[in-house]
Each structure stands twice: as structure tokens, then as C-alpha cells.
Design a protein with these regions (language model features):
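A short, charged, Gly/Pro-tolerant segment at domain boundaries
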Residues: 168-180
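Chalcogenol-based redox active-site neighborhoods
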Residues: 1-165, 180-186
Length: 186
């Protein structure tokens, strides 16, 4: 697990939604950064997809940048391909970048384990929260609220520490390429 206060690992990833490459440093005036490791096919992500789109789009109005990142092996999971990412983002209404981590190195650098998995960084790109979106799970009947991430974001924007413990994310394992699973996985 990436320790709190860790400086955000650098990345440069293609945005599936437009012909561009995106980095954290493209947004130097952001008040916070949300990284959401997601994919298209996982039922845990599908459950929160529309709410996450609203969350990320609303956060933009507060100068909070959200990045959705897909790190799955698209050879074995073609529903997660960049072409399908474009369709998914348009259907959900993402107004934020949906990035493709083909090498899976970004997921490894953040120690992401599942989809969805959330990392919130303050304006200095220091990790303030890592964990779940909320308590909703496929089949558990709990409403999707984004409460855990929203409370963490509210604390960061107020200049406060996010209270611990942070509830770990639960979802589908990142689909690592053959022989590419990190040491922390499994």
C-alpha cells in the first residue's frame, strides 16, 4: 500500500478520449488530484460508473482534477481496450481524462490492486487518502454515494488531514499481463 504523504509518482499516459498525453504536471494549479484505477468490464466499476462521472465532473468546478486510469491487460480483456474506453467514457459522460496504462507501470507505481481503487492527493501532490469510493457493492443493496472519497476530498480542500482508517477498495483484481504481476499482488 502506498504510504500516506507519499509524493504522487509521475506518469505520462495517453488519453483515450483525445489525441493527447496527460501528466499530473499538466494541472499545476489543481487544489487536489483524484486517481481512479478503473476498467470497463468489472461489475464493481459498473456499479459506480455514473456516480463517479458526476463526482469527477463536479470536482472540476472546485479545481480538483480526476483521472480515470485503466491498466488492464487488453489482450485477454478486450472490453477494456482504448477504443472501448472511449465508448465507456462517452456513455458515462466523463469530462475528465480516461488514461490507458498499457505497460501497467503506473498501476505498479501507485500500488493499485483492484478496480476501482482510489488515490487522493493534495495540491502538493502528497497522498492524503487511498481506499474505497463507498460501501456499495454489487448485490449488497447499499446506495452508491461516493461518501468515503467525498469526505476525504472535503477534508483536503479544507486543509485538514483525512481521518483514518481508510477503508481499502474492494473490486476486481487488476488484470495483469502474463508475468507482469507486481510483488505486492497475491
Amino acid at each position: 500500500m502506498l504510504p500516506l504523504s507519499t509524493k504522487a509518482p509521475k506518469f505520462s499516459l495517453p488519453n483515450a478520449l483525445e489525441d493527447s498525453t496527460v501528466t499530473l504536471d499538466d494541472f499545476p494549479h489543481a487544489k487536489a488530484y483524484v486517481l481512479a484505477f478503473v476498467c470497463n468490464h468489472c461489475p464493481f466499476v459498473k456499479l459506480i460508473r455514473d456516480h463517479l462521472a458526476d463526482f469527477g465532473n463536479s470536482a472540476l468546478k472546485k479545481d480538483v482534477v480526476t483521472f480515470a486510469i485503466s491498466s488492464n491487460d487488453v489482450e485477454n480483456y478486450p472490453d477494456d481496450s482504448p477504443a472501448k474506453m472511449v465508448i465507456e467514457a462517452k456513455e458515462a459522460g466523463y469530462a475528465f481524462p480516461y488514461l490507458y496504462d498499457e505497460s501497467q507501470e503506473v498501476a505498479k507505481s501507485y500500488k493499485a490492486a483492484c478496480t476501482p481503487d482510489f488515490f487522493l492527493f493534495d495540491s502538493n501532490q502528497r497522498l492524503a487518502y487511498r481506499g474505497q469510493y463507498d460501501d456499495a457493492r454489487p448485490g449488497n443493496g447499499k446506495p452508491v454515494t461516493g461518501n468515503d472519497l467525498q469526505l476525504a476530498l472535503d477534508a483536503v480542500l479544507a486543509g485538514k488531514e483525512v481521518p483514518e482508517p481508510h477503508q481499502p477498495s474492494i473490486g476486481c483484481n487488476i488484470k495483469w499481463k502474463q508475468g507482469n504481476a507486481p510483488d505486492y499482488f497475491g
